[in-house]
Amino acid sequence: YRGALLLTLRAQYQEELDVLSQQVTDLARQAAEEDGLTLTIEEQDVFPETANHPAGVERVEKAAQALGLPVVEMEEPMRGSEDFGWYLRQAEGAMFLLGDGEDHPPLHRTDFDFPDALLGTACALFQKLI
């Protein structure tokens, strides 16, 4: 017999994810040994946490304030940044979002329509950052 178990592990911090991954691996190995099974573990699409660097956050805040843009710190972490964590391991950067108000469908919904009016704001903010 052959079987497969697919799962996604997520955690707020890399250390928590490492512990969780080890626990799942240990449990799977134990179960396989008890039943005389061969276990193969593959990891795909592994990505690190996106942890903004304080200096990067400060630069974004100063640029936004210079343009008169409100800065709102999110109450909860956002995990929608699969690749950006790699960049932040190399540079003192910060991932930030441009809000378009509350009366718009969120990204990844079929009725999402990018608000073109944000382009000018985005360009001005990036110009301040460079």
Which residues does each PLM region occupy?
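Metal-dependent amide/peptide-bond hydrolase catalytic core
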Residues: 1-130
